[in-house]
């Protein structure tokens, strides 16, 4: 295997501007979400993250990572296919 010299990375003005715009966008989204949480907090839903219910915690994690579990079928025909005996 050939070893090569490290590649030099240069920070350009365009990169800095892009970073700043993305950071500002994320900050505005965070503020909007906090505002919604404060308004929704009067209903008592603001403490969902502090809930000790394992189902809601699992559901929050699944929502965060984008996992949507599919229910498993319980009948035998779905386990073994449609075999005729």
From Swiss-Prot:
Where does the record say this protein resides?
A: Nucleus
Self-association state and partner proteins as the record states: V-shaped homodimer. Interacts with CDC16. The mammalian APC/C is composed at least of 14 distinct subunits ANAPC1, ANAPC2, CDC27/APC3, ANAPC4, ANAPC5, CDC16/APC6, ANAPC7, CDC23/APC8, ANAPC10, ANAPC11, CDC26/APC12, ANAPC13, ANAPC15 and ANAPC16 that assemble into a complex of at least 19 chains with a combined molecular mass of around 1.2 MDa; APC/C interacts with FZR1 and FBXO5.
Segments for region (Disordered): 30-85
Which residue stretches, if any, does this entry annotate as coiled coil? 7-36
Main location, first listed in the record: nucleus
User: Which GO terms are recorded in the biological process aspect for this UniProt protein?
Assistant: anaphase-promoting complex-dependent catabolic process; cell division; protein branched polyubiquitination; protein K11-linked ubiquitination; protein K48-linked ubiquitination; regulation of mitotic cell cycle
User: Is this entry keyworded Cell division?
Assistant: yes
Phosphoserine is found on 42
Q: What does this protein do?
A: Component of the anaphase promoting complex/cyclosome (APC/C), a cell cycle-regulated E3 ubiquitin ligase that controls progression through mitosis and the G1 phase of the cell cycle. The APC/C complex acts by mediating ubiquitination and subsequent degradation of target proteins: it mainly mediates the formation of 'Lys-11'-linked polyubiquitin chains and, to a lower extent, the formation of 'Lys-48'- and 'Lys-63'-linked polyubiquitin chains. The APC/C complex catalyzes assembly of branched 'Lys-11'-/'Lys-48'-linked branched ubiquitin chains on target proteins.
Which ranges are annotated Polar residues under compositional bias?
73-85
The protein depicted here goes by the name Anaphase-promoting complex subunit CDC26
What are its GO cellular component terms? anaphase-promoting complex
Question: What Pfam families does UniProt report for this protein, alphabetically?
Answer: ANAPC_CDC26
Under which pathway is this protein filed?
Protein modification; protein ubiquitination
Family, as annotated: Belongs to the CDC26 family.
Write the record's keywords in alphabetical order, separated by commas. Cell cycle, Cell division, Coiled coil, Mitosis, Nucleus, Phosphoprotein, Ubl conjugation pathway
